[in-house]
Amino acid sequence: MGEKLTLTMEAKTLYIILSVAVEGEECRECKPYLDRYGELCDEFGKDSGEVCINRRFYFNALGLYWMTVGELFKAEQWFKTALEEDKCESGTENDVSDVVIKLNLCTVAIKQNDPERLCALLSELEEMKEEDDSEFTDRCRYMMQFGICVLYDSGYLELDEETAERFKDDIEVLKEDIIKNEASDKRCAAEAAVSVCMTAMLLIASDFATEAEREEYMRLMDHVTENYAPTLGPSRAAAINAMTAAIMCLRHDYRAASGYITAAEEFADSTEVMPVVLADLYTNKAVILFALNEEQRAAESAKKTLECIEKQRCEYVKYCNDKRLIGIMTFAQRAFLTVYGVLREVIKDDWELYEFVIRNKALASLTGKERNRVIQSGRMDTSLAKKIRAAQDRLAEIEARGVFVDSSADYEAEREKLREMEAEFAEEFPEDTVFTDITAEAVKRKIPCNSVVVEYSLYFEAEKADSPNEETKAAFDVFVIQKTETDCSIRRVVIPNASDIVERTEKFNMILQKEAQHEADSDDLDEKERLRASLYHDLLEPVEGFMAGFETVWLAPDTVAVNLPFDVLGRSKRDIPGDRHNFVIIECSRDFLFGSDGAANGSGSLIIGNPKYLLNEKTIPPKAKQDSDKDKKHESGGNERMVSYADLRNQDICPLPFSEIEANMVSLYCGESCFVGAEASKNHLLNCGTKRNIHIATHGFFDLEEETNSLYSSCLLFAGAGNWLKNGNATEKYGNGIVTADEISRMDCRNVELVVLSACFGGMNDAVLAKGFCGMVGGFAAAGVKYVISCLWTADDFASAVLMAEFYRQYKDRKLSPPAALRAAKKYLRRVTIQELEEKNWFDIALKNGELSSEARDAVLELSDMPPKFAPFNNEIYWAGFTCFRCN
């Protein structure tokens, strides 16, 4: 009895200590106390009868500890364990409520930059509050307010006037709460003050506050930062001061900002601060010091930011979910774009600046490649990797269902299972992993001789306090590296007005897509020519002189320019650089470090064409029969390899008879049989890692409206896709008939030299800040493929078949490299005449195809009657979209 009493007293003492310690900076030091308290909880069991021996409290405290030290996966899992633990039967107030635990999960989501998860948790909390608000203390209310502001600040929700007015009212209520709690509960007052600070910051940066209101909110933030931030501990105080400094920078008040950033640094120096917080602090400090003409100190702070980014990358490599990885690396990417703007003004060595770029461009892609390299090396538990992949495939199917069919009730349950395995993956990830040494010298050695690299890098321009800009300006630094057998030189070119270039790039791409679908009018075509010339003038003309004499040009665009057909940019469509150079698109020139110098080790070819999308039915009425007027505009009868979002929803997927002809042609050159019709299942692709060449001719999809996540909505369609879209039932042989970029990214395709996607939009990429290739190309890049050839817009079925036949003649018979073979094939397609098509029996082959619709048959006959010297595919819409990407 005496021993039990002693243990009980020990448990009560630890409970009191931990109740205070886990809420503050002392949490870092309390792990031994937590471990002992956990042992006592196990000793007494669930039904101890003692109020202070509380397993739910213990699990929540463990979550707080791991969150404080930056182990977010572990924190998340312990909070979830706490939620699953039953409350004490006594219902004592010493229990940690569901509300508090869910709010802790909200904090994890904020730190992971996962607004989708945060929004779901806040929605759950709102529902709980409507049912019973008894567990919602003032502090809970303040934390919810903070989370809601984060959703608007991140852009996940769009701030409107009505919401802004509500936020203004919230500030008044919060101010009253601060006064109410100031004497009795200083910490509660401080929590209210933090919510005030975040809400005020959001309004100051918006268009919905008057100048007088902004001034008032600035004074309020100043008061909060000075009087309440210290109460919350050094780490949070540092973050709040850095946040206030950022707002002062936005207002161009760099003197005031300097005071806040100094205070933030003092708080940070007194404790351990997560790298993401430090990166934000040093980024703001670099901007402030540069504005105040302390350039060398600014550069030192900028380099500290880069050190923090490196630490984040080494930590976040443990994320096996690319969607979450992109989200969490976005913070780091923004920090780099900002501090690089400072570094380039201070450092004049182009090789040094170039090294900053190749180490920090497209950070999520780089981190994902390093992670995949570890997985593929076999250093991790293979059974765990298989379990995770199976869970990810299941989640990908559910995500695809949400995009193309309907939402699924299984989604949250499956996602939670995956999150648990992600935590296990992070725990198992080798701590002694050595990452690729990315240096300018290493990349110089790997760049192929007798070629040019053109590396575009977006950055935010740094400003001076005495000449502030009305808004943040963006520009491109372009590094041009010429490599011969004996020399490797670098030049840097500055291209200003990046925001305007991005806008014009999007417009140019949109017109090309409209023209490919025969929907562009004369005004569109006139605008296209203006944009062609202006984009050439801005993006290529400044560097074209350095490309003279070099056939191969490795282009590494940034942002939406990755979707730009550079080879047709020129003063006019009759003077294009694609006639002078062989352009190959790369994500970043550091990727030469990840690929092999020689040919890939795979053997044989996988060839798929014209899948039977709807099984057990002879034919599917083509869309042309429903919209014949529109179809008459299509030279080859409307068999474009694209389905729109609505088409997929309506299960109206036309067959692609020319893609079967194409597959048979490719088979002849490769000496391999092809899979067509019902045999063209997705499983062939998902199990093709030992092949050297992969050719897929099918429908492709990409969400041009950017309403969905391209990891799941960027996809290829295979046999059975129509059945799944109609009834939602996947089968063992055919699955759901859809392969997403996400599924492909988890394959091991290091043996594959070339993937050819003869499908619409297969080459399109989402403009995601921390990613370069984000779509089907990004999926194959992550899987380890060396080259991908695909189309940026709607691909004409007949023209694609002719192009691909010539491509494989050049690639297989003439042994040209994929980029050189594609360039030769595009040149051939532009110039091939009706007579030459007849001589190669293209019209006879097409007309003998039994799946050809009557409209397509009429179009082929009409084409065959054209004058013999007529070049039917001279227009760039037939060939310019096909792009060669080198991924590794």
What spans do the regions from the language model cover?
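Amphipathic alpha-helical segments of tetratricopeptide repeats
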Residues: 38-46, 83-90, 123-130, 172-182, ...
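Residue at a conserved register position within TPR or TPR-like alpha-solenoid repeats
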Residues: 21, 66, 109, 203-205, ...
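Residue signature of alpha-solenoid helical repeat architecture, marking inter-repeat boundaries
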Residues: 8, 49, 53, 93-96, ...
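Alpha-helical solenoid repeat scaffolds used for protein-protein interaction
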Residues: 219, 226-227, 231-235, 239-242, ...
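"A position-specific structural signal for the A-helix of alpha-solenoid helical repeats
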Residues: 12, 16, 54, 61, ...
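Catalytic cores of enzymes
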Residues: 432-888
